[in-house]
UniProtKB/Swiss-Prot annotation:
Species of origin: Pan troglodytes
Pathway where this protein functions: Protein modification; protein glycosylation; Glycolipid biosynthesis
Modification comment: The soluble form derives from the membrane form by proteolytic processing.
Known catalytic reactions: a beta-D-galactosyl-(1->3)-N-acetyl-beta-D-galactosaminyl derivative + CMP-N-acetyl-beta-neuraminate = an N-acetyl-alpha-neuraminyl-(2->3)-beta-D-galactosyl-(1->3)-N-acetyl-beta-D-galactosaminyl derivative + CMP + H(+); a beta-D-galactosyl-(1->3)-N-acetyl-alpha-D-galactosaminyl derivative + CMP-N-acetyl-beta-neuraminate = an N-acetyl-alpha-neuraminyl-(2->3)-beta-D-galactosyl-(1->3)-N-acetyl-alpha-D-galactosaminyl derivative + CMP + H(+); a beta-D-galactosyl-(1->4)-N-acetyl-beta-D-glucosaminyl derivative + CMP-N-acetyl-beta-neuraminate = an N-acetyl-alpha-neuraminyl-(2->3)-beta-D-galactosyl-(1->4)-N-acetyl-beta-D-glucosaminyl derivative + CMP + H(+); a ganglioside GM1 (d18:1(4E)) + CMP-N-acetyl-beta-neuraminate = a ganglioside GD1a (d18:1(4E)) + CMP + H(+)
Cysteines joined through disulfide linkages: C115-C268
Any one biological process term the GO annotation gives: protein glycosylation
Membrane topology field: Single-pass type II membrane protein
Keyword Cell cycle listed: no
Ranges in the topological domain labelled Cytoplasmic: 1-7
Positions in the Lumenal compartment: 26-328
Official protein name in the record: CMP-N-acetylneuraminate-beta-galactosamide-alpha-2,3-sialyltransferase 4
Function: A beta-galactoside alpha2-3 sialyltransferase involved in terminal sialylation of glycoproteins and glycolipids. Catalyzes the transfer of sialic acid (N-acetyl-neuraminic acid; Neu5Ac) from the nucleotide sugar donor CMP-Neu5Ac onto acceptor Galbeta-(1->3)-GalNAc- and Galbeta-(1->4)-GlcNAc-terminated glycoconjugates through an alpha2-3 linkage. Plays a major role in hemostasis. Responsible for sialylation of plasma VWF/von Willebrand factor, preventing its recognition by asialoglycoprotein receptors (ASGPR) and subsequent clearance. Regulates ASGPR-mediated clearance of platelets.
Family: Belongs to the glycosyltransferase 29 family.
Annotated glycan sites: N56, N126, N305, N324
């Protein structure tokens, strides 16, 4: 080979070394690019990793609240919402009577479930992950994050969408699939009251929310599920070390994203995440979502400790309980 050729090879090798060093040295190096072929799914793998995170861990807890647990036998709860149902049982009973608690049969029957939790982070923008996301058995989305117009980056498949009344400002038919499960995360008794008025077309409630939820919401009641507060409890207790009893004015709680990861570790055998993470605190101008121009300032007063949650997610990544499809 001529000297010029050797110089070119040396230059390429140097560039490769620099790129590898930069990737390793970055704080957000918990990044696992999507393989072209499906990663093998090992039955029980997520459950095994989750037991190290959550301690005395069991999959006996139902994912969604069930009518039979409140109608025939009164299921006692030690905590009020969002960590339990204490004091809200009568209202909850009316909601469970008009909704369902089943998981889709095609998901329930899978021997090994491959899941991805799609966050709302800005780093999904121009990620071109859409096709890869659509290949998972279960795709979990959060709140009002849109799909229409962003399919190339976030995909179009939605198995479940976690939401609460104030985040329900999306068109259930446009931003979801006909068989998507819309999973209500109840933070307070008024959340049950809201979904009851929507589904039963009763007089709407306008007070008791930090942001006015939709008054008209065109949704099929068969798609609605009520998330078991057990997942909020273990996310708060085991991942964030938050006390279950907090003063009303200082209440901290997990984000919907961390809650969704906790749920996925319970439901799935393989768990990947995408679009998680916030800008550094000093970066005041960076938008936090892939679909809207809001910054970290909007999180003030939300009751979420994003720094603490970042540490919890990094711990899960280090343990291999979850893998990341975008930088973190």
């Amino acid at each position: 080979m001529c000297p010029a050729g050797w110089k070119l090879l040396a230059m390429l090798a140097l560039v490769l070394v620099v790129m590898v060093w930069y990737s390793i040295s970055r704080e957000d190096s918990f990044y696992f690019p999507i393989p072209e072929k499906k990663e093998p799914c090992l039955q029980g793998e997520a459950e095994s990793k989750a037991s190290k995170l959550f301690g005395n861990y069991s999959r006996d807890q139902p994912i969604f609240l069930r009518l039979e647990d409140y109608f025939w036998v009164k299921t006692p709860s030690a905590y009020e919402l969002p960590y339990g149902t204490k004091g809200s049982e009568d209202l909850l009973l009316r909601v469970l009577a008009i909704t369902s608690s089943s998981i889709r049969k095609n998901i329930q029957s899978l021997r090994c479930r491959r899941c991805v939790v799609v966050g709302n982070g800005h780093r999904l923008r121009n990620s071109s992950l859409g096709d890869a996301i659509n290949k998972y058995d279960v795709v979990i989305r959060l709140n009002n994050a849109p799909v229409a117009g962003y399919e190339g980056d976030v995909g179009s498949k939605t198995t479940m969408r976690l939401f609460y009344p104030e985040s329900a400002h999306f068109d259930p038919k446009v931003e979801n699939n006909p068989d998507t499960l819309l999973v209500l995360v109840a933070f307070k008794a008024m959340d049950f009251h809201w979904i009851e008025t929507i589904l039963s077309d009763k007089k709407r409630v306008r007070k008791g929310f930090w942001k006015q939820p939709p008054l008209i919401w065109d949704v099929n009641p068969k798609q609605i599920r009520i998330l078991n507060p057990f997942f909020m409890e273990i996310a708060a207790d085991k991942l964030l070390s938050l006390p279950m009893q907090q003063p009303r004015k200082i209440k901290q709680k997990p984000t919907t994203g961390l809650l969704a990861i906790t749920l996925a570790l319970h439901l799935c055998d393989l768990v990947h995440i995408a679009g998680f993470g916030y800008p550094d605190a000093y970066n005041k101008k960076q938008t936090i979502h892939y679909y809207e121009q809001i910054t970290l300032k909007s999180m003030a007063g939300s009751g979420h400790n994003v720094s603490q949650e970042a540490l919890a997610i990094k711990r899960m990544l280090e343990m291999g309980a979850v893998k990341n499809l975008t930088s973190f």
